[in-house]
Amino acid sequence: MKIAILSRDGTLYSCKRLREAAIQRGHLVEVLDPLSCYMNINPAASSIHYKGRKLPHFDAVIPRIGSAITFYGTAALRQFEMLGSYPLNESVAIARARDKLRSMQLLARQGIDLPVTGIAHSPDDTSDLIDMVGGAPLVVKLVEGTQGIGVVLAETRQAAESVIDAFRGLNAHILVQEYIKEAKGRDIRCLVVGDEVVAAIERRAKEGDFRSNLHRGGAASIACITEREREIALKAARTMALDVAGVDILRAERGPLVMEVNASPGLEGIEKTTGVDIAGKMIRWIERHATPEFCLKTGG
């Protein structure tokens, strides 16, 4: 097959691993910067051009689209879909997952347990918003934040009010969430490929922090997940219509709670921790689904 990887930086670990895994299985691979793609939208002859040339047909496209370029990145992916390329995660699913509020609403509607969460835009009554999630301690987030950026733990009511007031000054959407103290700065990242949790790690926050993101200096170890956690991870990925997802779970006293569903999970931390060839599993999933029947169905 001919496979395109949409990534702004082909030297990143995840992109390199996916390229290597595809080549090892005999596929032709090209890494494309989605921001350098430009499109002819025409009912008779739609096309995608890249750095002065018209791109050929790709059997499959692997999107590695960062949150900062979600709008144009998903537009480029959508054009590949229109031309009959199989997407490892559809553009609409990626856009949906990047919207934290919509994601939580969809997960809650499917009965998937979450931390108690409130969301507001410049709330007039900060006190009521805090009461909505059970009071302090609580976590205050910017809805648009990623990798632990724009996330603050407010240990007292006064601190929570101060943080919310500061975020209000940014004219931003504010997400307020109960703090799961018993998680002790740890969470479980389940990597879902298709209908299987292929790997799971426990991530631990660095000393003095409560955010377990590896990008923030957290540590990781192999996690043994329960059957309930496995079921929740798969259900969360299905709810978001993602074939590949990183599902983050907190272990609370009342049971596992889904924190987030990531549509473009990094592979470095989880592959190096578990030794699982996740990139290879992603390529094999593509091989099973990027079929001629798919191209006929989509018009490619």
Swiss-Prot record:
Positions of the ATP-grasp domain: 104-287
> Where is ATP bound in this sequence?
141, 178-179, 187, 211-213
Annotated binding of Mg(2+) 2, by residue: 260, 262
Has keyword Nucleotide-binding? yes
User: Per its UniProt record, what SUPFAM superfamilies does this chain match?
Assistant: Glutathione synthetase ATP-binding domain-like
A GO cellular component annotated for this chain's UniProt record is: cytoplasm
Q: Mind listing the GO molecular function terms for this protein?
A: ATP binding; metal ion binding; ribosomal S6-glutamic acid ligase activity
A GO BP entry: protein modification process
The record's annotation in PROSITE patterns points to: ATP_GRASP (PS50975)
Alphabetized UniProt keyword annotations: ATP-binding, Ligase, Magnesium, Manganese, Metal-binding, Nucleotide-binding, Protein biosynthesis
Q: Any binding details for the cofactor?
A: Binds 2 magnesium or manganese ions per subunit.
Cofactors (names): Mg(2+); Mn(2+)
What family is this?
Belongs to the RimK family.
What is the protein's known function?
An L-glutamate ligase that catalyzes the ATP-dependent post-translational addition of glutamate residues to the C-terminus of ribosomal protein bS6 (RpsF). Is also able to catalyze the synthesis of poly-alpha-glutamate in vitro, via ATP hydrolysis from unprotected glutamate as substrate. The number of glutamate residues added to either RpsF or to poly-alpha-glutamate changes with pH.
| Official protein name in the record | Ribosomal protein bS6--L-glutamate ligase
The beginning of the lineage is: Bacteria, Pseudomonadati, Pseudomonadota, Gammaproteobacteria, Enterobacterales
Which gene does this sequence derive from? Answer: rimK
